[in-house]
Amino acid sequence: MITMSSFKYAGLIISIIISLISCTHNKNYPTAFQPELAKAEAMMYRYPDSALHILQGIQPDIPSENEQYATWALLMTQAQYKNQIEQSDSLINIAYSYFINQDNAQRKALALYYKGILRHESHHAEDALSFYLEAATEIEKTNDYQLGFLINSEVGLMYLYRKLNDYAMEYFEKAHHNAELSDNQTYIAFSFIYIARAFSQKKQYNKAIEYYEKAIKIGQVNNYPTILASAMNETSFLFLKTGENKKALQYAKDCIKIKKTDQRIFSLGDTYRYLKMYDSAYFYLNQACLSPNIHTARSAYQALYYISQHYCPVKVDK
């Protein structure tokens, strides 16, 4: 039976817990909005839309609490990026200017990372790489393994784009190490895909396929269609390189079943072209030509041009 004394006892316990939380100081959060900022950051990776909603409800003071405003500005930058909201660099500049001079490696790394992201998006690749590399140094001082994965992946991708394959591999391996420590299966799968791309660019196709297959396995076990289709699509191309044509065609078909996109329609059509199955190639490449993505459409037209050198589709009179 619940008595009045039971309610008083429960109330006392709750009061003690709240008092303990209030007295516990986390150096990552200024005191005024500590609960809201902590809650938003805790939700950032899994529920970025909810994190954004919380941050939008906070009205920090500007200049009386510099740390408070810098923290809010940094998390708001992160939330907007994760929700694919276009933004200027005004908020990240506030966060960067504050945290770059503080003894907080996690905040410094996060600010440097998003400075790099926004510089990269505005086509300043050298600046972006410089920020990423500095962020990579700072993140090694922390246990934020999810951020460590993201930072090292960006560095690796920039080196891979420049065909600096050994440097790319070094950072992809760091990204994989961080992904494993974070136990984030999505990040682990993408780290395998990135390592596979580096092996592919080094023309070590069998090693690349080995790592793509690891990503595919994670996609299958965890029902991650985006990862599964992406890895299978890229592996299909490598199977053509290694002469495993049946596997190449099957993977290309499976990608369409998982999720049909213009790029995957093109890939299937181009696989048929490579195998000299021109009727099927013509069918899918014509669809890909209608893509609003100029790169996909251009590739499809180019593939059709190559086909025209060997094949003329039969037109039926009506």
Segments the model singles out, each with a brief description of its role:
Residues I2-G11:
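Bacterial N-terminal signal peptides that target proteins for export
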Residues S5, L20-K318:
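A "functional boundary" signal
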Residues G11-S19:
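Bacterial N-terminal signal peptides
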